Amino acid sequence: MKKFLLFILTFTFSFSYSQLSTRTIEVKDGQMSKFIEMAGKKTKKFNNEDGAARFWTYEILTGSDAGKIWRMQAATPEMRDNWDMNSEEVEYWQKNVSPYIANGSVNGNYMWNYAGPYSHNVDSENQNHVMMLVYTYKDSGEQDFWRFRERVVAARKAMEPAPKGSMHSVVCSSGCNGNVAAILFEYESWADQQNYNQEMLPKMIEKYNELYGNNAYEQDGSKVDKALTENGRGRIHLRFIPEASSD
């Protein structure tokens, strides 16, 4: 995940929001290892050079899409405008990767903006276990929702030691119903996540209250609850696959 961080930071040096797209891929039964191998070869061949789009690949571990692939692309608007469906890159994918996709099942093409001010990036290694929290908030709740995210970032940055894994925030810009945001937390493993929840999360809450007043975390969290739509909160776990991702 470190290279993901470096690429995103390069984008966000010039502007606060970077454009991402995601899609969900269903792999044929028994072909996951082959899909990962061939998707990795394609990605290493075409998506590591300057001026090329970058891709990151995850396996979905929980939820209705468990067992599928979640693939993220980062590209500038110029890259998207000049995308050629007849390019060598696309032909390589169709010839070498598509045969392992079930019935051409590539779904859920969503566009996201990377929300740099609401993300906390640390120089981490081996943080390949990801928890993604997905929120849908009301128009009237936008300020309360993002104030809380901003304060969480400030509290994390003030912690000593800082959390080992990064926290990335993205906002859906196309394809979603309503105001959708996703927060991705990086860990080394399930055990590392449990350890964070038991040891680091209470320290983060303590720092939050130290910065913003007694019980501020609980009060702001309550405002977020009211800011969300009905059933506007979800949780998905992912496994980052570095061998099928840009370096």
Question: What do these predicted ranges mean?
Answer:
Residues 1-20:
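Bacterial Sec-dependent N-terminal signal peptides
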Residues 17-247:
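Short S/T/G/P-rich N-terminal loop/turn motif that feeds into the first structured element of a domain
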